[in-house]
């Protein structure tokens, strides 16, 4: 079988140590809705702050760069690329590659690829919740070299979903034909564009779909090149500290526009209600982490019970800042043992020995409830 193209888990050759992950609840929920619509395997999807045209998979996580979002003009192209990425997850390629690397380089640890941005650890333990993590570049380089078999399997998964969902591939063909020369290195071990185009042409007769409003919103946010020019104006103005809320009136939920305004550091009316409205339509756990952090910072004690209850939510627990949030929460309500316990876990995860040693020696293990202790990194 002809290998159509080598999409992703691709090798980054960027001269940087790490790549910043932007946490965007709207972006992440957009892909969650795609998963539900097309009955795809569950995956977390994040955006990376880099202009390289790229996407890759680590574990059950899919990463898209800002550059690829900017350069994709049609939503069906993004969906097709996403199908390919999910194909890697469906076939468990990441774990296969990780095992291969670990067996050949036993002196290195490849499990912990996420490292916290050093800047957020300045100051005291009352720092806010940061919105980014970073991906260790050297580890990514080793993990993202695919075998031909992996690419065939991911291509097949993509084509099955293109065919099943009748997605037109004309714009996908154009996307690959127009890739900058700097990206050609990703395809050196694969057939020419001509062969890829031949394989995709059988799907060019399907009816083209119109871009969704939410796709256009993401295009405006990360590329300033949405077909809805008012969205571009909204984000361009916001970047200058100017709020033109009328430019965002076409968005499905105006609370998302208010969220962007708030995240830009501009005060809005009733922040609490904005978060409550968003959480009704968007179950993203990071959005909840942000909301709980705002509750703690503003001492809105009527919602402390919600924070307490959601400590047992597995999605909240999967968030990198879970331990930090609950260390901060218990510090707010003057439960010093639980606060130090959770900060201890957080700094262990972050691999900051001085801070972890400090907090891990400041609580009485006998005062920690069994349910909390069951969440510990340190048993």
Identify the role of each PLM range.
Residues 26, 40-42, 50, 57-63, ...:
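Extracytoplasmic
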Residues 63-80, 144-146:
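Short pre-active-site segment immediately N-terminal to the catalytic Zn-binding motif
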Residues 76, 86-103, 167:
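Catalytic Zn2+-binding segment of zinc metalloproteases
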Residues 93-121, 128, 176:
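Post-HEXXH active-site segment of zinc metalloproteases
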Residues 4-7, 12-60, 91, 140, ...:
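Hydrophobic or amphipathic, alpha-helical segments that drive membrane association/targeting
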Residues 50-51, 60, 67-69, 86, ...:
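Solvent-exposed coil/turn segments that connect beta secondary-structure elements
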Residues 21, 29, 44-45, 142, ...:
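Extracytoplasmic and endomembrane cell-envelope/extracellular-matrix remodeling and assembly machinery
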Residues 92, 119-146:
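Substrate-binding clefts and substrate-entry loops adjacent to catalytic sites
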